[in-house]
Amino acid sequence: MASLFLSSLVLFLAALILVPQGFAQYHLNPVDEPPVNEPTVNKPPQKETPVYKPPQKKSPWYMPEQKESHLHVYDKHLTAEHNIHI
């Protein structure tokens, strides 16, 4: 009785291991794949046609010049004479 159970267990485990590997590619359709190593085609580089860019004109509205902040001079750190909170 034990040998029948042991042999059926071994047969069942062997079927679990072997059957999925045997039927793995069975239901798949064959796939046409392009060749991996295609020959290289030497084409000359394509030259881009030059694009005409019209000269830039100044805008019609007036914009006053921006004054530089005193923070720019002192590397964005106030000194003691500029600090009004001391």
UniProtKB/Swiss-Prot annotation:
Q: Where is the region Disordered? A: 30-59
Please list which residues make up the signal peptide: 1-24
Which stretches of sequence are listed as region 7 X 5 AA approximate tandem repeats of P-P-X-X-X?
34-68
| Record's subcellular location | Secreted, Cell wall
**Keywords on this record?**
Cell wall, Nodulation, Repeat, Secreted, Signal
> Would you identify the family this protein belongs to, as annotated?
Belongs to the plant proline-rich protein superfamily. ENOD12 family.
The name this protein goes by in its record:
Early nodulin-12B
